[in-house]
Amino acid sequence: MKGYLDMNRLMLIMYISIIIIVSYMLIPVAYAAPDDEGAMPDDDLIQQQLDNLDISEIAKFYENFASEDYPDIGTLLKDMLRGRIPFDVWQIIKNLVSGLFKEVWQNIGLISNVLIIAIAAGILNQLQSSFDSKSAGEMAFYACYILIIMVVIQSFRQMMNYGQEALSNMVLFMQAFAPTMYTLLVASGAVSSSVMFQPLMALLVGVVGTFVKDVVLPLLFLSAILTLVNHISDKAPLGKLADLLKNICSWALKLTFIIFSAIVIIQGITAGSFDSVSFRTAKFAVDNFVPVVGRALSDSMATVVSYSALVKSAIGVIGLIILASICLFPAIKIAAVALVYKFAAALIEPIAQPRICQCLNSIGDILIMLFTLVFSVAVMFFIAIAMLIGINSPQAIL
């Protein structure tokens, strides 16, 4: 238990540290924003950068997953390049909260079905003495429990599909989004970062996506099945095995998160520092060793690189928005159903048999684990995009 608590404490520290690092990586976007109209970016140069950039794949994901209230991707990109964020943060928070309660309300039917069956099982249990034998009461309980299992498996399988779909879409998005960022890294002078990140990111995203979908999710589903079977009878003790599988999923996720975050952050800091030094050296050489036009040439190079870095930051923030949109809606659905099971377990505890309450509560815990899994993968990819944004930011290269 102590080791488990220490691991949770370590994960909490990791989350806080990553939030600080990601916040720092997003500072370039804020610093790049103009303070007044006189500091507005060169529209022609920005348009030239955008014309040479293929964001059609990113636009498809944006159109599929972004809210209807959001502006189109072209307008959003230009607004961000001018330092304007066309979003109402409080409205987004309200939409998320209302979406959670809406999902809970839509699953009231699930609570009703479980409550009716659980109450029937409780009544039959109280009337057990009127049966000719104890086995008849057990048979009545088994009948009710099988009905509950059918309801639980149907909803749990649907939540698993939401989780698998979210993970697949996040991996596909990262595979479509990364080439654009690599192109902008090269344009902004981060050649080393692009060369180092491209194979590494492709490998990490593919490995994490495959591992979570093909290993962790099936183990989690098997844990849920064993949990349901375990509570059918006291003579089928499978609770420890179900807990073991759930703990394996938890530890595998935590280990994957730590390894992924450490590799991406260390790689980003190392490559970014090297590119910054390389660019400053090249700028100094052109400025001092090219006769007559050296100064003008180095200033022009710095301007082009700065605008490329600015476009990269804006594209990166749009990527974060799309990634959040892909993750949040399935995560909200999963969290809502988890709350429904937890609420149902608490509600029927006074009248239903303990085995039914424990079953529903355990399924709620597994759904919370599924929510954590989807959210953690999104955070990993979020870190990767934030590191790409932070490499060769305008204030770092000038």
Protein language model annotation of sequence segments:
Residues 2-118, 122-141, 155-165, 169-170, ...:
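Gly/Ser-rich, low-complexity
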Residues 197-322:
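Generic multipass alpha-helical transmembrane bundles of integral membrane proteins
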Residues 294-303, 340-398:
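Transmembrane alpha-helical segments and their short flanking loops
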Residues 313-354, 362:
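Helical hairpin unit composed of two closely spaced alpha helices linked by a short loop
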